[in-house]
Regions:
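SIR2/sirtuin-family catalytic core signature
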Residues: 60-62, 143, 148-249
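Extended, H/D-rich, highly charged conserved domains that either
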Residues: 1-140, 144
């Protein structure tokens, strides 16, 4: 839905732009409210028995690229790169200005919409200002809504190119992300490990992305999970992320 209305920015159709503003900020508010709810639950539960992937990444000597919008990756790794944008940022696409929310867990959503965002939006032809959440709709053509994205994609490409081991967690390899697939293919030497509970879908998409033959793999079973190995360097593990210990990968 976001992708369809985003084209209004290319064509200058204000009706599409207004719809995009409405839908994207509603989505942003929902995701932020979910983060706030989870933060309150985490405070109520002092000793959690099950640790999320983000919990496991904390303190690890690794670089993180995330395709999620939530702030969990940045809480785990302050240098995490947000490939598709983040809930913590928004951008005035008309004037190319970037803005940052200080703390999503404490932001008052009603106050933000009424007393801040409403004053920042303007369709006045003499002074147009269109702030939108800094996350990208799933488009094959990467729209550059801010210079910040150019910097992010450059640093991500360098990170992937120089890596000796790449662990990919629950990522769908969407056809809209061909740009990231190009980055992966540029690194011919790194060991690539993909963890996804939907083995068949993951295998099909990974092979398309990395240009591997889908039927040429060695199958193993380890700790009750199916493992497929391709081309002596790409490994797919069919497991739920909650069942994975990153120290063993």
């Amino acid at each position: 839905m976001l992708a369809g209305y985003f084209y209004g920015f290319y064509t200058g159709q204000n009706s599409y732009i207004r719809d995009y503003l409405y839908i994207s900020w509603i989505l942003w508010a929902y995701l932020v409210s979910e983060e706030q709810r989870k933060a309150q639950e985490d405070v109520a539960v002092e000793n959690k028995d099950n640790h999320t992937i983000y919990d496991q990444l904390e303190g690890k000597d690794c670089q993180v690229i995330t395709f999620n919008y939530t702030s969990y990756a940045s809480q785990t790794s302050p240098t995490a790169l947000y490939f598709h944008g983040s809930l913590k940022e928004y951008v005035d696409v008309e004037n190319k200005n970037d803005f940052l929310h200080d703390d999503l867990t404490t932001i008052d959503l009603e106050d933000f919409f009424k007393n801040q965002l409403a004053a920042e939006i303007s369709f006045d032809p003499d002074h147009k200002s269109i702030p939108i959440p800094s996350f990208l709709p799933p488009l094959k053509l990467r729209p550059v809504i801010s210079k910040h994205y150019i910097d992010t994609w450059y640093h991500a490409s360098q990170m992937v190119l120089r890596a000796s081991k790449i662990i990919i967690l629950g990522y769908s390899f969407s056809s809209a992300d061909n740009y990231f697939c190009d980055m992966l293919r540029e690194n011919h030497d790194a060991q690539i490990i993909i963890i996804d509970k939907n083995m068949e879908t993951a295998s099909r998409n990974v092979c398309r992305c990395l240009q591997l033959e889908a039927n040429r793999y060695t199958k193993q079973i380890k700790d009750g999970h199916e493992i497929r190995k391709y081309n002596n360097r790409v490994t797919i593990i069919g497991a739920d992320l909650l069942d994975v210990n990153l120290d063993d990968v």
